[in-house]
């Protein structure tokens, strides 16, 4: 695996990121865990997720979002992997229908 410097931090991230957009929507948790395990075995330490990943195809706040982030979080917690992975995320979806989050 090739790595790149992350800014001036001294940290090195894999040039390939493992995307998690389908985790929870198309890819069930056991398969997602296997994909992340395989990614780490291949040297990938840069994972990409977002608060809308793993949610319904059409934005509907009542159906929930962030399922991908939850799956990645459970995978990290299982075996103390947090120190092994750089996690990129972004936010988009409002946190409530009232706007008072």
Residues covered by each model-derived region:
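Glycine/proline-rich, positively charged
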Residues: 27, 94-101
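Conserved radical SAM core fold
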Residues: 52-55, 92-96
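A short, structured active-site edge motif that brings together acidic residues
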Residues: 83-95
């Amino acid at each position: 695996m090739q790595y790149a410097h992350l800014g001036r931090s001294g940290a090195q991230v894999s040039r390939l990121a493992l995307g998690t957009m389908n985790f929870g929507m198309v890819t069930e948790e056991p398969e997602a865990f296997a994909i992340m395990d395989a990614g780490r075995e291949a040297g990938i330490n840069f994972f990409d997720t977002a608060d809308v990943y793993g949610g319904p195809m059409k934005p509907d706040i009542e159906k929930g979002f962030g399922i991908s982030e939850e799956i990645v979080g459970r995978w990290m917690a299982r075996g103390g992997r947090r120190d092994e992975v750089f996690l990129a995320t972004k936010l988009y979806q409002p946190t409530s229908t009232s706007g008072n989050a």
